[in-house]
Amino acid sequence: MVKLAAKCILAGDPAVGKTALVQMFRSDGTHFQKNYTLTTGVDLVVKTVPVLDTNDSVELFIFDSAGKELFSEMLDKLWENPNVLCLVYDVTNEQSFISCTKWLEKVRSQTSGISLPGVLVGTKTDLAGRQTVDSAQAQVWALSQGLEFFETSVKEMDNYEAPFHCLAKQFYQLYREKVDIFHTLV
């Protein structure tokens, strides 16, 4: 049984639902807070995620940071050498989707040229009548950036775990590839 540890950056504009998503995931769906205050610094959420079809797991260290601090020195330090990325936008806020390009560039600038597995998550799908970001367009963009695509409603407890299970699986697959390469060298 292998237990890996991965640094996960949670990025996106303010008020897109990053904190709600990660808090729901941390509590296994038992905690949905109706009123959130904007994150002003960084919260660290740690949760062990089993890797499907194995006896192994990945402990995700999820850095939930304030969305308004796009170019702060604090983020530069905290975001050094991430292992996986969870990029979040609000399906009812087109600007939050457009901003994903800037967030992705910011996070990738911290990776020293290595491939960074990740997911793009559209939140607040329970507000479908107000949706301004086309799901197909978001999925095409995500795939063009090498990201898996998910939509979720934390309020409705819909699909909030899937992005994190995907991140754990992506990180685990990178680990397995490195182990396989190592075995070919020995």
Swiss-Prot record:
Gene Ontology annotations for the cellular component aspect, listed alphabetically: centrosome; cilium; cytoplasm; intraciliary transport particle B; nucleus; sperm flagellum; sperm midpiece; sperm principal piece
Annotated binding of GTP, by residue: 12-19, 64-68, 123-126
SMART domains, per database record: RAB, RAS, RHO
Primary localization: other
Recorded superkingdom: Eukaryota
Keywords per UniProt: Cell projection, Cilium, Cytoplasm, Differentiation, Flagellum, GTP-binding, Nucleotide-binding, Protein transport, Spermatogenesis, Transport
Organs and tissues of expression: Expressed predominantly in the testis (at protein level). Co-localizes with RABL2/RABL2A in the midpiece of elongated spermatids within the testis (at protein level).
PROSITE patterns: RAB (PS51419)
Name of one Pfam family that matches: Ras
Gene Ontology MF terms in the entry: GTP binding; GTPase activity
Reported consequences of knocking out the gene: Null mutants retain the ability to ciliate and survive through gestation. They die shortly after birth due to different phenotypes reminiscent of Shh signaling defects: polydactyly, lung isomerisms, and structural heart defects. Conditional knockout in male germ cells results in infertility, abnormal sperm morphology, significantly reduced sperm count and sperm mobility. Mutant mice with germline deletion of IFT27 die shortly after birth with structural defects in most organs including the kidneys, where duplicated collecting duct system and/or duplex kidney is often observed.
GO biological process: cilium assembly; cochlea development; inner ear receptor cell stereocilium organization; intracellular protein transport; intraciliary anterograde transport; intraciliary transport; kidney development; smoothened signaling pathway
Transmembrane feature ranges: none
Record-annotated disulphide pairs: none
Cellular compartments annotated: Cell projection, Cilium; Cytoplasm; Cell projection, Cilium, Flagellum
Subunit note: Component of the IFT complex B, at least composed of IFT20, IFT22, IFT25, IFT27, IFT46, IFT52, TRAF3IP1/IFT54, IFT57, IFT74, IFT80, IFT81, and IFT88. Interacts with IFT25. Interacts with IFT70B. Interacts with RABL2/RABL2A; binding is equal in the presence of GTP or GDP. Interacts with IFT88. Interacts with ARL6; recognizes and binds with the GTP-free form of ARL6.
Reported function: Small GTPase-like component of the intraflagellar transport (IFT) complex B that promotes the exit of the BBSome complex from cilia via its interaction with ARL6. Not involved in entry of the BBSome complex into cilium. Prevents aggregation of GTP-free ARL6. Required for hedgehog signaling. Forms a subcomplex within the IFT complex B with IFT25. Its role in intraflagellar transport is mainly seen in tissues rich in ciliated cells such as kidney and testis. Essential for male fertility, spermiogenesis and sperm flagella formation. Plays a role in the early development of the kidney.
Family designation: Belongs to the small GTPase superfamily. Rab family.
NCBIfam families (alphabetical): small_GTP
PANTHER family: DRAB11-RELATED
Protein name listed in UniProt: Intraflagellar transport protein 27 homolog
Organism of provenance: Mus musculus
Gene responsible for this protein: Ift27
